[in-house]
Amino acid sequence: MQEQAPAQPITAEELLSWRRQLLAQGGEPGQLDWLLEMAGGLGWQELQALRLHPSRPVELHCSLHQLHRLWQRHRLQHEPLQYLVGCCPWRDLRLAVAPGVLIPRQDTELLVELALEAAMDLPQDLELLWADLGTGSGCLAIALAAAWPASTGLAVDCSAEALAQASANGQTFGVNGRIQWLGGHWWQPLRPWWGQLALVLSNPPYIPTAELAHLDPVVRWHEPSLALDGGSDGLGALRLVVEGAALGLAPGGMLLLEHHHDQSSAVMALLEAAGLEQPRPHRDLEGRWRFASGRRRQS
């Protein structure tokens, strides 16, 4: 969304009446309130307080007309709100996102926590070098670099559009001095560092091709299929990432993956077939097996 001059103040009752009218036409209240916060600058607690003070003046970052246009594009054309406002809150970051770049999901935040835990259990003689395969918006790479300042990282994506967005986000958060952004497919751009990577994490596409047609239109029509389509069984990219780990990881290095909640057994089998030790599943916030880890055997 382009920057706009602050709108003229309105009363709390005018805003609440506008909100009621829009929701009467359809849509989720939580999503409209998210738009009010991200585009209008009005947080949930402030919105709640307005109910008690109907005559209070309210200053928004943009006009109700502008908010209405964005909401209609979301409700009628199913455009993701994150694309419409150009940002996505994720972990402790506010990442810029745009069409062509996958919108970071909250579940993926746990992959950073798993990576930080794994970092504490790495062999002491390993260089603190990590890689993010399929970086997209750069969410994982930026969060890990910010939380692990002693480390350096390599972030890979085959989409030039995604890589440009990730690099811009890295610049915003001041971590580009410790991340190299590399174009290419999975392990291929990392060849100069094969055998040196202490930690590799990846949230690759894992949705079976046949299931893409059944996704919510917000996802199906607007987010990049390149970041969603995992092939006929959903495991195509996961296989490539796991199979490369035996060469790419340093001895004792860790691989961390996100996958679909019904793929845990298959991913465990892939880790074992690749010769990785200590294959483990990990649960998401809903208690589903959504992540996996394995370690390259130490020499």
Regions found by a protein language model. Give the residues of each.
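Non-catalytic accessory regions of SAM-dependent methyltransferases
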Residues: 1-56
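General small-molecule cofactor/ligand-binding pocket signal
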Residues: 96, 180-182, 280-282
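Residue-level signal for inorganic ion chemistry
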Residues: 35, 78, 108, 140, ...
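Conserved SAM/SAH cofactor-binding pocket of Class I
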Residues: 110-214
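Conserved AdoMet
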Residues: 37-117
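Mobile active-site "lid"/loop adjacent to the S-adenosyl-L-methionine
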Residues: 205-237
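Conserved Class I SAM-dependent methyltransferase catalytic core
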Residues: 232-294
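Generic C-terminal helix-cap and adjacent flexible tail
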Residues: 120, 277, 295-299
